[in-house]
Amino acid sequence: ETAPKVEEATKKLFPEGIPSMGADALRFTMASYASLGRSVNFDFKRAEGYRNFCNKLWNATNFVLMNTEDKDCGQDEMQPLAFTFADQWIIGKLQQAEAAVAEAFETYRFDLAAQTLYEFVWNEYCDWYIELAKVQIQTGCPTTQRTTRRTLVRVLETILRLLHPIMPFITEELWQVVAPLANAKTADSIMLAAYPQADKEKIVQTAFDKMAALKDLVEEVRKLRGEMGIAPNVKAPLFVEGSAELEGLLKYLPSLTRLTEAKLVDNLPEAEDAPVAVCNGARLMLKVEIDKAAETARLSKEA
């Protein structure tokens, strides 16, 4: 009885037809709705967001391939490896994601599995680890570069296997290229490969602590830039007064926060007009020459 009314309303709502989102994006959307009951108010914006997620995964894979194909990816176990805290952090987060996804599938909470995978891939692997890996590949020694490439491809290959039950098409396509680089081509198809299982022994708490400290530093530097009104295209030097333990974190800041350099000093330089931020006991200062007259005029205008 309601079918004609639904058809008429749908035609009015989508006069040009329903836009194509792709099978994987549709499957991921339906998985995210799994716990909402029998009635689902389908949100096309949500499906569009998961289509963007597919694009994000594709672009991340392209980056990994550009930096690993025909290069030493650390699959020769006889070669030395040097895992940084960033490598250990993403490997540890992967174990947590694997455990959470396994529990979600066991309890038929496909929505939680989808949410866990989305957050890990987008927020942790793409937004954080890939950016840190760029620094390690550009500035690290050959052993660090080898280890970074190994981590990039092995984590990505595991991501593809984790995602496969929900997004079978894009993961199959990408896995055929990524798996050989990770020395993980154990079957002709990803659907025949073993599903990932968490190994809690690979979770290193000190790496988590260092990553949390780095995130705090990045947040404070970005706040400083905002407070000082520094344009996104302007780079400035950062001076940090703090413990020697910060030295290993500072090399990541220039690329993450658009700095010319990040330097650890015994005492901050004298600059009466430069604001100072405090982060976990460290004092941070961006050294930027400020036009005092222009700044005074701006503040007066805002007041």
Model-identified regions with their sequence ranges:
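Feature 926 captures the class I aminoacyl-tRNA synthetase adenylation module centered on the KMSKS loop
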Residues: 1-23, 48-303
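Extended amphipathic secondary-structure runs
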Residues: 17-36
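Short, solvent-exposed helix-loop connector elements
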Residues: 38-46
